């Protein structure tokens, strides 16, 4: 349910962009992100830090897009969020902590060197897509950027998550691999 909530603002943005324009879609994105935050808090009694950061960035850059009637601001939002993620992962690693390990380390046992590689791989992913977003935003038409933002980045993120899962599975201790592949069927 929580993952579905994360995609609702994106779906609303895309639908309203196709029906109206970037400014209506941006206004709806701000409202949908605020509603998402409220619903998340109502259901789970907490809001993740990244959701809050995303809301602030969406609100600031979305408002600037509408106020100045300039779609460049909303185009920058994606890059800024990805830069924040890359910097956050880098800073946490330099402080001796791994955000990825913190999220998954309770369920999965891996050597710290593997967690570090996964962390750096995601830093690379976010950095690459931050730059690619700017390139597409300024070198290609707005329709291409919207499709890239909604579909390209979504598909790339899912694919990278799957690749990360495969990499993790490859480096899991044998006991955990056996436990994760055991399926008990009761007659």
Curated annotation (Swiss-Prot):
Keywords, sorted A to Z: Cell inner membrane, Cell membrane, Membrane, Transmembrane, Transmembrane helix
Membrane topology: Multi-pass membrane protein
GO annotations of cellular component type: plasma membrane
Locations listed in the record: Cell inner membrane
One Pfam family in the UniProt entry: IspA
Taxonomic superkingdom: Bacteria
Signal peptide: none
TM regions (residue ranges): 22-42, 50-70, 80-100, 118-138, 148-168
NCBIfam families: ispZ, PRK00259.1-2, PRK00259.1-3
Described function: Plays a role in cell envelope biogenesis, maintenance of cell envelope integrity and membrane homeostasis.
Similarity section: Belongs to the YciB family.
Protein name: Inner membrane-spanning protein YciB
Gene transcribed to yield this protein: yciB
């Amino acid at each position: 349910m929580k993952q579905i909530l994360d995609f609702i603002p994106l779906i609303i943005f895309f639908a309203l962009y196709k029906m109206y324009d970037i400014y209506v879609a941006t206004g709806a994105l701000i409202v949908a992100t605020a509603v998402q935050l409220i619903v998340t808090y109502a259901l789970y009694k907490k809001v993740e830090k990244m959701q809050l950061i995303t809301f602030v960035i969406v609100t600031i850059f979305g408002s600037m897009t509408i106020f100045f009637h300039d779609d460049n601001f909303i185009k920058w939002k994606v890059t800024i969020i990805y830069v924040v993620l890359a910097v956050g992962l880098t800073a946490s690693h330099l402080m001796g902590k791994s955000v990825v390990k913190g999220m998954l380390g309770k369920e999965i046992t891996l050597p710290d060197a593997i967690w570090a590689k996964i962390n750096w791989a995601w830093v690379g992913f976010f950095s690459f897509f931050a730059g690619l977003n700017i390139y597409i935003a300024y070198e290609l038409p707005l329709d291409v950027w919207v499709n890239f933002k909604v579909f390209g980045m979504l598909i790339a993120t899912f694919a990278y998550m799957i690749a990360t899962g495969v990499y993790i599975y490859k480096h899991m201790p044998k006991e955990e691999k056996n436990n994760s592949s055991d399926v008990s069927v009761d007659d």
